[in-house]
Amino acid sequence: MKRVIVSVINDLVTDQRVNKSCITLQKLGYEVLLVGRKQRKSPPMDQRSYDTKRMKLLFEKGPFFYAEYNIRLFFFLLFHKANLLLSNDLDTALPNYFISKLKCIKMIYDSHEYFTETPELVDRPRVQRVWKRIEGFVVPRLPEMITVCESIAELFHEKYGVKCHVVRNIPARAALPPKGNKKALNLPEDKHLLVLQGSGINIQRGAEELVEAMQYLDDCFLMVIGGGDVLPILKQMVADLHIEDRVHFMPRMPYANMMAYTQLAELGFILDKDTNLNYRFCLPNKLFDFIQAGVPIVASRLVEVGKIIEKYQIGLFIPDHDPKSIAATIKEGLSDTSRRAVWQQGLAKAAEELCWENEQQVLLDIYKHYE
């Protein structure tokens, strides 16, 4: 049986894009092995239909972490048989590329974001140069690659001449759990529920301003679900503003559990700031999660996110990132019943069209090139 090794640098638990890629490869008859890492605070792995391997590392962040993971991944790939390699993001690309050449194995590269233009790198030019060199070495040598949206695909094509396919981060309709109720999930029944979710609740994504806006919204309750480097700051802000009764933090959780909470929200948030190319052109999972959950969206005016919101009429935009402006936009989104009716119609149409059952055909066609 033909075998594919799929690699990613996270702990596998909540990466829905990689999970869908693995399941799609299984449909083409591949035996799948997914490789990632296990952190000290990683949740246990859920049951999968394919094999997984999480490597325990000595380092959990910084240059030694990236170096250790890449070296460990290189030797893992070297000593494990595969007919195909799927590399997810730039931080796994180098060992996959070297092994593909060394063992004459085909490699697929899937870039989940515009890695070299993330704020974590833009603010550290020396580190950014290292990753740009890796990108500049690997990507031009690939016949084709995959990424998450048209804008990023165009950037890669213009810069490196590589053929770039677009597969969006869209959930399956079948993955949505039955809608529950506030009481069963211990949520306040007398408040408007709001949700900010994701595994990348990081700097420059508007989370701080959203939390600050909650001091002006005494009839609202914000659920912050997931992980990210800005969470300690958010928790301190909540304590300093004395709004513990309005903001509740929940850890990363399995997708079905997260969506059970998301479905009960009246508004979901995508407030990334247009401070770097990665955020400007982002098309995050949560956009499509909100669509499938039937939750109208409050967003900043980002290129790809804005296209979807305007096309389907499924939400509204903040004028700026001032907390009072955000609070005013939230109040508008909750109180305008006629617009909410329009949004619900748009969400129903978008959910029918923007689902994995449709999007997976694009990925199947790409993978068939490598059979």
Feature names for model-found ranges:
Residues 36, 53, 132-178, 249:
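Donor nucleotide-sugar binding/catalytic pocket of nucleotide-sugar-dependent glycosyltransferases
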Residues 71-79, 94, 98-102, 126-145, ...:
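Membrane-proximal helix-turn-helix segments that form the acceptor-binding/catalytic region
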